[in-house]
Design a protein with these regions (language model features):
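Acidic (Asp/Glu-rich) sequence patches and key acidic residues
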Residues: 1-133
Length: 133
């Protein structure tokens, strides 16, 4: 079975791009190859994930298909979640941000759908939140 997590950003109540440079900086060491649909990530422990992202569309939200248990993935995601207005969410679950002050930047619809986002202190905490849902 496939599982996806989604990362989007909002600004002034509307969808906004996550700077591509920030996404590339977080995932860069783990990008095995790029293709038009996204990036294959490969981690030191053998874990692999696919990031669906369109580099040329200017939107720069993304989803991670079959997120690996590799700690490097979750640390990279937390780095991205520190961008104001950025939130990670998953089907049937909740929403996570990287800092309490960032909740104010989110679209109101996020809280309506998922409830108040939880602040993750480290990548392992994101994994635990997903596993509990």
């Amino acid at each position: 079975m496939s599982f996806d997590i989604f990362v989007i950003r909002s600004e002034n109540g509307k969808v906004a791009p996550i700077p591509l440079e920030i996404i590339e900086q977080a995932f860069g060491p783990f990008i095995k190859y790029r293709e038009p649909a996204g990036w294959e990530l490969s981690f030191p422990d053998g874990g692999r994930s696919f990031v669906y992202i369109k580099e040329d569309d200017g939107k720069h939200g993304f989803n991670v298909n079959r997120p690996a248990s590799s700690p490097e993935l979750w640390t990279a995601l937390l780095d991205i979640l520190r961008v104001p207005g950025t939130v990670l969410f998953w089907p049937g679950g909740g929403a996570v941000v990287g800092d309490n002050s960032l909740i104010l930047h989110l679209m109101p619809a996020i809280a309506e759908i998922f409830g108040t986002p939880i602040v993750a202190r480290d990548g392992a905490e994101i994994v635990k939140l997903i596993e509990r849902s």
